[in-house]
A protein has these predicted regions:
Chain A
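...captures the hydrophobic TM-helix bundle architecture rather than a specific catalytic motif
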Residues: 1-222
Length: 222, 560
C-alpha cells in the first residue's frame, strides 16, 4: 500500500487538485464531528431523562463532586484550546517551531486535565461512589444517585478517552511537524485536528455545568 | 481501447501479453495486493466475499429454525437453542449482511465510477472500514461459538442486562465495533459525493442510485453513533451493574428501547434505501426510458431519511409509552408511506409505455416493486395502534419486515448484482439460469413469508419453538417455501462462481445502459476506473435513454 503521495505538494493521486483534497478533508472532519455529536447525544439524552426523573437525587449526588477541581480543569482545557489555535495559526504562517510549541502546549494542558481527572476518579473510588456492587451513597446502596454516577463516569470517561486519542495523534503530528511535512499551503492535518480538539473541549464545556454545578447551591460540597 | 496505468502495479504485470488490458482485478497479484488494497473496487470485492459468508451463516440459522417449525412440538431444538438461533439469525443478517450489502459492495464499487472519479475520498479509511467489519464479525462468531446469544437481535433490557445467561457483553461490543465500519462508509460516501463529482456532474444529473446512497450515508453517520452508545451502556450495565436500565435501581428499561430504536428504525432505511436506488437504475435501463419524476425520487430518498428519525416510538406502542406519544408516532409513521409510495408510483410510471424487457435484473426489480409494496402496506397496518396491539410480536410483524428486508433489499441486491456483474468481473452470468433462479426465489419467498401474515393474524407469537396444532399447515408451507428460497440462492451463488471462469466475456456495456459506469468504464474497469488521462466531463442528464424520442409509444421494436 504505497501512498501515491506527491512529495512536494502532498496531493494524493485520486484528487484533481490540492484544493479539492483540502475541502474533502475538512468536510470529512465536520461529518465525523456530527457523528460525535450524536454519539455524546445518546448520553446527554439519558442524562436528561434521569435528571428530570430524579432531580433531588442528582443534586445530592452532584454535591459530592469537587467543583474546584472541575473548574480548574475547565480553565486548563480552555488553555489547551488556545495553544491548539496558536498551533494552527503557526501552521498558516509556516512556522515549524510554532506548530510544535503549540502542540506541546496542548499536550501539556491535556496531560494536566487527565491528571486531575485521575485524582477525581480515585477520590470517587475511595468513597465507594463508583457504580456497581460496591456503591454506597451516604450509607445506602444503589438508588438514583447511582444513576448519576453511572452517567458521570460514562460521560467523563468517554470524554477522557477522546482526549487520550487526541494526545496520541498529537505525538504523531509532532513527529510529522518535526519532519517538515506541514507547509503554509498544506497542513490539513493540523487544521482538522484543531477542529477535533476544540470539539472535545466544547463537550467538556457542557459536561462541567451539567455534572458539577447542579448541586452547588445546596452548599454541602467540600 | 487498451490503457496503460502508471501505477506501481503495472510493473508486476508487465510481462503479460501486450494486448491484454490491465483491469483492477489483474493489476496486481498476491494476497497482499488484496488485503492492503486501497482500490474501492477491490474493497467492494472483499466486502462481497465477507458478506456472502455471513449470508450463508445467517441463512443456515434460518433454515434450522424453519426445520424446527415443521412440527408443532419443539422436537428438534431445546427452547434455549431456538432462542439462540433466531437471535444469531437476526444479528448476523442485519448487522453483517443487510446493512453492508448494497452500500459496501455495490456502493463501494459504483459511487466513484458513477460520479466520474478515481476513488472514494478516503481510500484508506475505506479499507479500515472493512477491517473493522471483520473484527466485529469475528467477535460475533466468537459469541456464536462460545454459547451464543439469546436476547433477540434487539437486546432488550432488562432481560439482556440482568437475566440472560449468554454472552451479551461480548455481543454488544461486537455490534459496537461493527457500527464504526458503517459510519466510515457513510462518511466516505458523503464527502465523495459532495466534493469529487466530475465536471458537469451536477446534483440533478446524478443517477438516483447515488441519491439513495447519499441519503443512506446520512442515516449511517447520524444514527449509528447512537446505537454505539446504547450498546456501550448495555455492556457497562451488564458487566458492572450500574443500574442504568435496571428498574430496581431507578433505571428505565424503556429508555433502552428508545435509544435502541432511535438507531434501529432508521437502520431499516439503511437497509432499504440503497435497494431503492438499485431499482431506479434497473427500471430505467430495462424500460429504456428517462426516469419518470426524477426529482421526486431523489428528494423522496432524503425525505425517508429524515422522517425515519422521528418514528422510532412505533416499536413501543405496548411498552408503556404514553398514549399521546403513541398517537404522534403512529401519525408520523404513516407519513413515511408518502415518499415510499412516490417512488413506487414513479417506477410504475417509468415502466408505462416503456420498451420493457425481462432480463434477470428486471425480474428482480419487478419482484421488488410488488413485494416491497406488500411489505410497506402491511407496515401501515402496524402503524395503526389498535391493530398493532392485536398483531404485536406475532408472525405478522415477522412477515412484514421480511417482505421489506428480503422481498425488498435482498431482491434489490440480487438485481443489482446481476445488473453490474459483468461490470465487476467482465463476464456474463448465464441469462436463462438467472431468470429461472429469479423465479424460483420469488416463488420460494412468497411461500415462506405469505403464510406468516396469516399465522400472525391468527395469533401465532414470534420467537417460540413450538406452537398450537392449528398452525401446523401454514408452518409446513412456510418451511417448504424456505427450502425453495434457499435453493434459489444456492443456484445463484453457484452460477455466479461458475461464470467467473466459464462465463461468456462481456462487452463494455452489456445492457446498452446509460451512466458513466457503462459508457466510460470498461468491464472490468482499470484501477483508476477510466482510461488513463481521460478526464470525465458529463454533458447530459442521467438516463438519457432515447426510446421515447425515437418512438411515440405504439410498442414495437426499436433499434437501440
Ligand atoms: Cu420501526
Amino acid at each position: 500500500m504505497s501512498d501515491h503521495a506527491h512529495s512536494t505538494t502532498g496531493l494524493v493521486h485520486h484528487f484533481d487538485d490540492i484544493e479539492q483534497q483540502h475541502e474533502a478533508g475538512t468536510l470529512g472532519m465536520w461529518a465525523f464531528l456530527i457523528t460525535e455529536v450524536l454519539f455524546f447525544g445518546g448520553l446527554f439524552g439519558a442524562y436528561a431523562v434521569y435528571r428530570s426523573a430524579y432531580p433531588e437525587a442528582f443534586m445530592r449526588a452532584s454535591s459530592h463532586l469537587d467543583v474546584d477541581l472541575g473548574g480548574v480543569n475547565t480553565i486548563v482545557l480552555i488553555c489547551s484550546s488556545l495553544t491548539m489555535a496558536l498551533s494552527v495559526y503557526a501552521a498558516q504562517k509556516g512556522s515549524k517551531r510554532g506548530i510544535i510549541m503549540g502542540l506541546l502546549g496542548t499536550m501539556f494542558f491535556g496531560a494536566i486535565f487527565l491528571g486531575v481527572k485521575v485524582i477525581e476518579y480515585k477520590d470517587k473510588w475511595d468513597h465507594h461512589l463508583v457504580p456497581g456492587d460496591n456503591f454506597i451513597f451516604e450509607g445506602n446502596p444503589g438508588g438514583p444517585e447511582q444513576l448519576y454516577f453511572a452517567l458521570y463516569f460514562a460521560m467523563t470517561g468517554v470524554h477522557a478517552f477522546h482526549m487520550i486519542v487526541g494526545m496520541v495523534i498529537i505525538c504523531w503530528m509532532i513527529k510529522k511537524a518535526h519532519r517538515g511535512d506541514f507547509t503554509p499551503g498544506h497542513h490539513p492535518l493540523v487544521e482538522n485536528f484543531g477542529l477535533y480538539w476544540h470539539f472535545v473541549d466544547i463537550v467538556w464545556i457542557f459536561l462541567f455545568p451539567l455534572l458539577y454545578l447542579i448541586g452547588a447551591h445546596s452548599g454541602s460540597h467540600t | 481501447m487498451s490503457s496503460t496505468l502508471h501505477t506501481p502495479a503495472q510493473h508486476a504485470s508487465a510481462t503479460k501479453g501486450a494486448k491484454e488490458r490491465d483491469t483492477y482485478l489483474t493489476a496486481d497479484y498476491g494476497w497482499k495486493s488484496w488485503l492492503f488494497t486501497v482500490d474501492h473496487k477491490r474493497i467492494a470485492v472483499l466486502y462481497l466475499i465477507s458478506i456472502m459468508v455471513f449470508f450463508l451463516i445467517g441463512g443456515t440459522f434460518a433454515l434450522l429454525m424453519r426445520a424446527e417449525l415443521m412440527t408443532a412440538k419443539g422436537d428438534l431444538f431445546e427452547a434455549e437453542t431456538y432462542n439462540k438461533l433466531f437471535t444469531m439469525h437476526g444479528v448476523v443478517m442485519i448487522f453483517f449482511f443487510l446493512i453492508p450489502s448494497i452500500p459496501a459492495v455495490l456502493g463501494n464499487f459504483l459511487v466513484p465510477i458513477m460520479i466520474g472519479t478515481k476513488d472514494l475520498a478516503f481510500p484508506k479509511i475505506n479499507l479500515l472500514s472493512w477491517y473493522i467489519y471483520l473484527v466485529g464479525g469475528g467477535a460475533t462468531l466468537y459469541v456464536a461459538i462460545t454459547g451464543g446469544l439469546d436476547t433477540g437481535w434487539t437486546f432488550y433490557a432488562p432481560y439482556s442486562s440482568t437475566y440472560a445467561n449468554t454472552n451479551v457483553a461480548a455481543a454488544a461490543i461486537a455490534v459496537f465495533i461493527t457500527g464504526f465500519s458503517s459510519i466510515l462508509t457513510g462518511l466516505n460516501f458523503i464527502v465523495t459525493i459532495h466534493k469529487m463529482r466530475a465536471p458537469g456532474m451536477t446534483w440533478f444529473r446524478m443517477p438516483l442510485f447515488l441519491w439513495a446512497q447519499y441519503a443512506t450515508s446520512l442515516i449511517m453517520i447520524l444514527g449509528t453513533p447512537v446505537l454505539a452508545i446504547t450498546v456501550m451502556l448495555l455492556a457497562l450495565e451488564r458487566t458492572f451493574h450500574i443500574g442504568i436500565f435496571d428498574p430496581a435501581l431507578g433505571g428505565d428499561p424503556v429508555l433502552f428501547q428508545h435509544l435502541f430504536w432511535f438507531y434501529s428504525h432508521p437502520a431499516v432505511y439503511i437497509m432499504i434505501l440503497p435497494g431503492m436506488g438499485v431499482i431506479s437504475e434497473i427500471v430505467a435501463c430495462f424500460s429504456r426510458k428517462r426516469m419518470f419524476g426524477y426529482h421526486f425520487i431523489a428528494f423522496s430518498s432524503l425525505a425517508i431519511a429524515i422522517f425515519g428519525f422521528v418514528v422510532w416510538g412505533h416499536h413501543m406502542f405496548v411498552s408503556g409509552q404514553s398514549a399521546y406519544a403513541g398517537f404522534v408516532f403512529s401519525f408520523l409513521t404513516m407519513l413515511v408511506a408518502i415518499p415510499s409510495a412516490v417512488k413506487v408510483f414513479n417506477w410504475i410510471a417509468t415502466l408505462y409505455k416503456g420498451q420493457v424487457s425481462l432480463e434477470t435484473p428486471m425480474l428482480y426489480a419487478l419482484g421488488f416493486i410488488g413485494l416491497f409494496t406488500i411489505g410497506g402496506v402491511t407496515g401501515l397496518f402496524l402503524a395503526v395502534m389498535g391493530l398493532d396491539r392485536h398483531v404485536h410480536d406475532t408472525y405478522f410483524v415477522v412477515a412484514h419486515f421480511h417482505y421489506v428486508m428480503v422481498g425488498g433489499m435482498v431482491m434489490a441486491f440480487m438485481g443489482g448484482m446481476h445488473f453490474w456483474w459483468s461490470k465487476m468481473f467482465g463476464r456474463k452470468y448465464p441469462e436463462a439460469m438467472g431468470q429461472f433462479a429469479a423465479v424460483v426465489i420469488f416463488v420460494g419467498f412468497n411461500f415462506t413469508f405469505f403464510p406468516q401474515f396469516i399465522l400472525g393474524y391468527m395469533g401465532m407469537p414470534r420467537r417460540y419453538h413450538q406452537y398450537n396444532d392449528e398452525f401446523t399447515a401454514l408452518n409446513v408451507l412456510s418451511s417448504a417455501g424456505a427450502t425453495i428460497l434457499g435453493t434459489g440462492f444456492l443456484m445463484t451463488i453457484v452460477y455466479f462462481l461458475w461464470s467467473l471462469k466459464w462465463g461468456q466475456k462481456a462487452p463494455q456495456n452489456q445492457w446498452d445502459a446509460k451512466g458513466l459506469e457503462w459508457e466510460k468504464a470498461q468491464s472490468p474497469p482499470p484501477t483508476f476506473n477510466f482510461e488513463d488521462g481521460e478526464r470525465i466531463v458529463v454533458t447530459e442528464d442521467a438516463y438519457a435513454y432515447t426510446y421515447e424520442e425515437s418512438h411515440t409509444g405504439s410498442g414495437h421494436e426499436v433499434k437501440k
